[in-house]
């Protein structure tokens, strides 16, 4: 999974069993990447994927991830706490209480121009459905939004 950290550092994170488990540094501040991997080792549930979202609203970009994740053509995943979304990751499952956070990772042309999301698919009931291509909604998603 591609990752752009707040300081602009880029990495590819490895996902196993629904969790970030390490990865490869690409560019930027190597210490940022190493600190993230060390945190995953100390407290593995901080890297658990707990949300996948697709923007569905025709709105202008605000520069605030919490709002921009809702804009049509964006996709985001989140790690960490998921109990507020009906998930099972509650604060007591973290090794360190300060790590019991919900961290959104937004993919959008204005936010992550270095990362190209060519296609997003959902695999359900043995079938793949394309939801987005090149930050644009697929006909399937457009039909759902009509």
Tell me the role of every PLM-derived stretch:
Residues 1-146:
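Metal/cofactor-centered catalytic core regions of large enzymes
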